């Protein structure tokens, strides 16, 4: 899926990923390709992103929103 991580400073990450693991205000979730559309608030956490090449990336999240849209598009918006 195509993931964008956007902060007040601009685009922090943009690329193709296999999975995204985040902590929402309702609990921890992992999103894979072809996930159903979703919008949820994020809790303070470390987002774990696995890129298509297998590289694991970690992003510190204080708060924000996670959106999974149609067509394997996902965005994390952080403040």
Residue ranges and their predicted role:
Residues 2-79:
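Compact, glycine-rich, soluble single-domain proteins
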